[in-house]
């Protein structure tokens, strides 16, 4: 049975979710809402500076998209309550505008005829967050959920493997994060975050992130044990988590590597990857795993204090997991 999905917001994540859906037989995108006109949406879908050309045909007919021969309804509504998702057969909405991240605002999609909503960013209220490889099994039928953030999707599986095998006393995370759309090409106004307003291509910019604390929401046993920060760096895509951990149970770095490798081949296959190659960030462009453990990059001071490194394509990996969550809540 194919799940019919609508996308609200055709920005970076909306478009990569769309591309990822073309690789699946269980999910079909039937409607897109964005304030862009259809011709421009088609152009943005066809050509991507980071991920290359769209693998398929994209046309516009009567104001709607025709992708690989299938019509996709296009609308330009500001208020989600007016979207009439039911008329397009939409069952689940991928809420990708970044604007409707509370139960109250996202519920407008339900009012408009959808059955369920997946937010493609961390919720700003108590809406539950689900991360594949961490807490999918706790889903209890909620109609509005969040896929958390790309960084939480990298960190949570890594932290879970460490905690399940060795226990985490406390940990600090740094994500070295690629540039995103909220940053400035040259210095510009950013009243809430002065550093964030500095030119993205010229600077390494320290920034805050709620990703580590969010792990405490998806893995309650780690609540209060993790916090973190970010450095925004002048690369277009692919980020890396540096997790410094004090272990409850002593373990050699070799033992940690074995645990990661076993998880990547077992319960976390498709979520957690493992590599012993001499990799750099561009090697992970297009990576669908949300966390790839870099065995060669990590270090240990002793058997209780270690630094672990894990890579993620902050666009592709995350977008694939949005679809995994849509499929999971539709069972």
Curated annotation (Swiss-Prot):
NAD in keyword set: yes
One BP term from GO: glycolytic process
Root EC class: oxidoreductase
This protein's UniProt keywords: Cytoplasm, Glycolysis, NAD, Nucleotide-binding, Oxidoreductase
Annotated binding of NAD(+), by residue: 12-13, 34, 78, 120, 314
Binding site for D-glyceraldehyde 3-phosphate: 149-151, 180, 209-210, 232
Active site per UniProt: 150 (nucleophile)
Reaction(s) catalysed by this chain's protein: D-glyceraldehyde 3-phosphate + phosphate + NAD(+) = (2R)-3-phospho-glyceroyl phosphate + NADH + H(+)
Enzyme Commission designation: 1.2.1.12
Protein's job: Catalyzes the oxidative phosphorylation of glyceraldehyde 3-phosphate (G3P) to 1,3-bisphosphoglycerate (BPG) using the cofactor NAD. The first reaction step involves the formation of a hemiacetal intermediate between G3P and a cysteine residue, and this hemiacetal intermediate is then oxidized to a thioester, with concomitant reduction of NAD to NADH. The reduced NADH is then exchanged with the second NAD, and the thioester is attacked by a nucleophilic inorganic phosphate to produce BPG.
Protein name, per record: Glyceraldehyde-3-phosphate dehydrogenase
The organism of origin for this protein: Shimwellia blattae (strain ATCC 29907 / DSM 4481 / JCM 1650 / NBRC 105725 / CDC 9005-74) (Escherichia blattae)
Lineage: Bacteria, Pseudomonadati, Pseudomonadota, Gammaproteobacteria, Enterobacterales
GN (gene name): gapA
């Amino acid at each position: 049975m194919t799940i019919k999905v609508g996308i609200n917001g055709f920005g970076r994540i909306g478009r990569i979710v769309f591309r990822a859906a073309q690789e699946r037989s269980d999910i079909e995108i039937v409607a897109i809402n964005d304030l862009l006109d259809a011709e421009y949406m088609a152009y943005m879908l066809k050509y991507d500076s980071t991920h290359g050309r769209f693998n398929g045909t994209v046309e516009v007919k009567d104001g709607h998209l025709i992708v690989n021969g299938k019509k996709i309804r296009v609308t330009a509504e500001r208020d989600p309550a007016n979207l009439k998702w039911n008329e397009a057969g939409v069952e689940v909405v991928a809420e990708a505008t970044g604007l409707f991240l509370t139960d109250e605002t996202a519920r407008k999609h339900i009012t408009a005829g959808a059955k369920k909503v997946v937010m493609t960013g961390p919720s700003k209220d108590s809406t539950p967050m689900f991360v594949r490889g961490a807490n999918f099994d706790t889903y209890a039928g909620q109609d509005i959920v969040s896929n958390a953030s790309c960084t939480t999707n990298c960190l949570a599986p890594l932290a879970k493997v460490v905690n399940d095998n060795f226990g985490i006393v406390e940990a600090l995370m740094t994500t070295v994060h690629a540039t995103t759309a909220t940053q400035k090409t040259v210095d510009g106004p950013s009243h809430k975050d002065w550093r964030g307003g500095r030119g993205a291509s010229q600077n390494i910019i320290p920034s805050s992130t709620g990703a580590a604390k969010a792990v405490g929401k998806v893995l309650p046993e780690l609540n209060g044990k993790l916090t973190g920060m970010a450095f925004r760096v002048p690369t277009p895509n692919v980020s890396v988590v540096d997790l410094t951990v004090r272990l409850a149970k002593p373990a050699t770095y070799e033992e940690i590597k074995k645990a990661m490798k076993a998880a990547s081949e077992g319960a976390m296959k498709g979520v957690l990857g493992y590599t012993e190659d001499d990799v750099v960030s561009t090697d992970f462009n297009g990576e669908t795993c949300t966390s790839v453990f870099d065995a060669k990059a990590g270090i240990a001071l002793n058997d209780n204090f270690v630094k672990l490194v894990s890579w993620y394509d902050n666009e592709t990996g995350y977008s694939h997991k949005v679809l995994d969550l849509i499929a999971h809540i539709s069972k």
